[in-house]
């Protein structure tokens, strides 16, 4: 380092430094050269107990900063670590600028070059000239005749600023107007490490500004001002990132503009007229290694965390207001390779406006509106927002959202394909951590498929949410409607087709465990109520190919309703249902409770064609029917017995023209009419079944022939012809059985020792049904 001249006048407090040179390494150009540095300090410094400088002149300052130089990196890193603690402490002690005053500032013929060969950085500021009348935070009436101006070239692009001044007394102020036109930002971006990482690289951008800076001296009891206002425009900004060794787009916009009404650096107040972003595009990419924007955010958050201690003190006192924020014609894409097939979702025509956003206390809420095309439909949002403390009241509306747009996620979770149109009209309020909501949701033209087979379809499924309150942990649903639904259930040896795939079931089980743990930690369970749930004009088709013969049944014209279903202890809900099956009708009416689980429901079957139910009867009871008509009335019950849920049914059954078949399809027994009075069944272990009275009118010829053969054989063996005659008198009339029971795999009845026909009937029933009822 060399210096040509150093001079200091103690009487006038003038300091002059001339010919300063700091040589570069290995015969490189000087790192720093300074032709002349002049400072004229004022005696007012002693009065104000703060620096007061009458004049500062810097002439011919030329610096070269080599970012890839080891000494420079050591200096920069050491500076950050050594002074970080003290600067943090200083910033926490005061959130305002220190007291000082500098007048008649002049910087001439200066330049700065920044180099980093490893990152191909070669940026320069040349022909730098700056003149300012003053920069002051002190109440001082000193005059200045300097007219503010600025000129320089940034990488060859001229930047000019001109100004005016009111130099005397209480009106001491200066204004500087700076204009930048179409400055290429790409070279400037290279100077910022956070903008040159694999997760974020800014490639293009053009900057245009017109900014006014006002310096107003603190005089006549009025505080000093440092005010900034103007407009900033950035055009054609493009950001990319590296994913799987490929450079892919991250974000871009056609134009972003900022209209700064006033920024008061001393009073920590900011007023923004408008922020407008035109044609923004954002590309979200989710891979097994993570979400691309999360990786980008981590780069910023690490730097922000390091500076948070320094900045928290200075930022805490800021008051701000933004009159308007707009996004026009935005687009976003979502690509997710974590599911198969890969998901791709597009958001287009995104337009959003926020007005009156501020952190001022007791301010009116900001108004927000947004709309976009997504999932093949339209989505809109209107909200009132108060930032601090956070309060949001919003209305979300959607129409024509296509479930098929989420096909990859639905298939990945369940193994099914789904389609349908979703509409929403939801109101929500957020106050701190509490959320309340209400609204409606509907799904039309629903279809759930597995391959080419349709599992579920519905014309309409809708929900009306009365209220949701996370603070109270309560949900009240006004109504649920399922209209014109068709369910096609098929049981195979692999399981029920309506169940999710193994992968989906595993995820569902894992989620259920996680939810259970969350509920356990939360302590208090959620309370919910459904005022009304209805199923209209629906059908249920069932086939079971896992049994021989295959079983099939169809329940059509299903109309059902549930009222006041609730999680409350002992709350009873009313249920009502009617449907058609096997050529007849069935109906149910009664009450159920969920806590504890109970049911008391009357049931009615009328005109049921037994032949239509033959496959189901054979598969699950071991007997079928060639013909017959079933009528039934009774009550279904569900209750807890010895800590086990037990289902029961009690009532009367009658059958006409009944021809019973065994599992092989052969006629087992026939009769014209049969009535079971006082039938009671319970799903205990083993199953309990009893009939108070069974009447069978006119047994068929197959039974009478079998009994004649049995009685004839008995008479030959015993030599008692009276036994055969006694048996014969039962064959032409009716059979009455009292106290029929099913125990230990066999049917029995009271007082049938002399009734061979009755004994034969029960024997055949036992043989045919025992394996199914065990």
Residue ranges and their predicted role:
Residues 1-25, 166, 170, 179, ...:
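N-terminal amphipathic/hydrophobic interface segments
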Residues 5-71, 91-113, 144-146, 172, ...:
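Flexible beta-edge/linker motif
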Residues 36, 83-195, 223, 304-405, ...:
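Elongated, acidic membrane-bridging lipid-handling scaffolds
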Residues 41, 132, 180, 215, ...:
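Hydrophobic residues in beta-strands and at strand termini
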Residues 70-78, 194, 248-249, 289-297, ...:
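Flexible, surface-exposed loop regions and adjacent strand-edge segments
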Residues 76-85, 294-304, 499-510, 717-722:
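Surface-exposed loop/turn segments flanking beta-strands in extracellular/periplasmic regions
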Residues 159-161, 207, 228, 437, ...:
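Structural detector for hydrophobic anchor residues on beta-strands
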């Amino acid at each position: 380092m060399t210096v040509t001249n150093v001079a200091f006048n103690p009487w006038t407090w003038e300091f002059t430094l001339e010919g300063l040179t700091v040589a570069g390494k290995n015969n490189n150009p000087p790192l720093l050269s300074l032709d002349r540095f002049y400072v004229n300090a004022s005696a007012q410094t002693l009065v104000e107990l703060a620096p007061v400088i009458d004049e500062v002149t810097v002439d011919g300052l030329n610096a070269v900063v080599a970012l890839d130089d080891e000494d420079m990196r050591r200096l920069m890193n050491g500076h950050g670590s050594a002074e970080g603690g003290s600067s943090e402490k200083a910033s926490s002690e005061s959130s305002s600028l220190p007291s000082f005053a500098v007048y008649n500032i002049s910087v001439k013929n200066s330049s700065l070059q920044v180099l980093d060969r490893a990152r191909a950085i070669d940026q320069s500021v040349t022909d730098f000239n700056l003149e300012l009348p003053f920069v002051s935070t002190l109440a001082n009436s000193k005059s200045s005749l300097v007219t503010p101006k600025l000129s320089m070239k940034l990488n060859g692009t001229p930047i000019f600023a001109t100004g005016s001044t009111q130099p005397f007394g209480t009106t001491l102020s200066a204004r500087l107007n700076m204009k930048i036109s179409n400055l290429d930002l790409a070279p400037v971006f290279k100077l910022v490490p956070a903008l040159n990482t694999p997760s974020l690289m800014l490639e293009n951008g053009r900057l245009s500004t017109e900014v006014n800076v006002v310096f107003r001296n603190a005089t006549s009891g009025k505080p000093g001002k440092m005010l900034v206002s103007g407009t900033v425009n950035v055009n054609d900004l493009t950001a990319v990132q590296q994913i799987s060794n490929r450079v892919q787009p991250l974000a871009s916009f056609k134009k972003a503009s900022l209209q700064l009404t006033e920024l008061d650096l001393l009073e920590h107040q900011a007023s923004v007229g408008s922020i407008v972003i035109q044609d923004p595009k954002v590309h979200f990419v989710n891979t097994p290694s993570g979400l691309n924007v999360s990786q980008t955010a981590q780069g910023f958050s690490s730097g922000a965390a390091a500076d948070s201690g320094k900045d928290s003190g200075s930022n805490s006192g800021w008051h701000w207001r933004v009159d308007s924020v707009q996004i026009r014609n935005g687009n976003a894409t979502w690509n997710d390779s974590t599911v198969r097939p890969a998901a791709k979702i597009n958001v287009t025509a995104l337009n959003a406006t926020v007005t009156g956003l501020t952190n001022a206390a007791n301010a009116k809420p900001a108004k927000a509106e947004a709309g976009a095309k997504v999932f093949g439909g339209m989505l809109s949002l209107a909200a009132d927002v108060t930032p601090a403390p956070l309060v949001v009241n919003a209305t979300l509306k959607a129409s024509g959202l296509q479930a098929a747009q989420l096909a990859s996620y639905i298939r990945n979770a369940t193994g099914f394909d789904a389609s349908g149109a979703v509409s929403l009209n939801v109101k929500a309020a957020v106050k701190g951590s509490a959320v309340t909501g209400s609204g409606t949701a509907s799904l039309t033209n629903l279809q759930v498929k597995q391959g080419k087979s349709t599992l579920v379809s519905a014309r309409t499924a809708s929900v009306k949410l009365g209220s949701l309150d996370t603070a109270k942990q309560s949900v009240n649903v006004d109504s649920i409607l399922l209209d014109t639904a068709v369910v096609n259930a098929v049981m195979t040896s692999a399981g029920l087709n309506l169940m999710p795939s193994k992968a989906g079931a595993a995820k569902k089980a894992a989620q259920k465990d996680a939810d259970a743990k969350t509920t356990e930690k939360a302590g208090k369970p959620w309370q919910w109520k459904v005022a009304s749930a209805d199923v209209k004009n629906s059908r249920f088709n069932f086939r079971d190919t896992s049994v021989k013969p295959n079983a099939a049944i169809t329940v059509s014209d299903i109309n059902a309703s549930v009222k006041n279903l609730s999680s409350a202890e002992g709350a009873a809900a009313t249920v009502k249902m009617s449907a058609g099956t096997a050529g007849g009708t069935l109906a149910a009416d009664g009450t159920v409770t969920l806590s504890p689980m109970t049911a008391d429901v009357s049931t009615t079957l009328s005109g049921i064609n037994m032949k239509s139910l033959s496959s189901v009867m054979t598969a699950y009871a071991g007997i079928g029917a060639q013909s017959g008509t079933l009528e039934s009335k009774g009550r279904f019950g569900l209750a807890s017995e010895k800590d086990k849920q037990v289902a029961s049914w009690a009532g009367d059954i009658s059958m006409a023209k009944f021809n019973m078949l065994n599992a092989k399809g052969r006629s087992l027994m026939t009769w014209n009419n049969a009535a079971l009075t006082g039938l009671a069944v319970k799903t205990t272990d083993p199953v309990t079944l009893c009939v108070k009275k069974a009447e069978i009118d006119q047994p068929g010829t197959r039974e009478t022939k079998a009994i004649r053969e049995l009685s004839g054989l008995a008479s030959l063996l015993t030599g008692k012809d009276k036994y055969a005659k006694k048996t014969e008198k039962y064959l032409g009339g009716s059979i009455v059985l009292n106290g029929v029971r099913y125990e230990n795999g066999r049917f029995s009845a009271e007082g049938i020792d002399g009734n061979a026909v009755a004994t034969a009937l029960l024997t055949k029933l036992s043989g045919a049904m025992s394996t199914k009822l065990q």
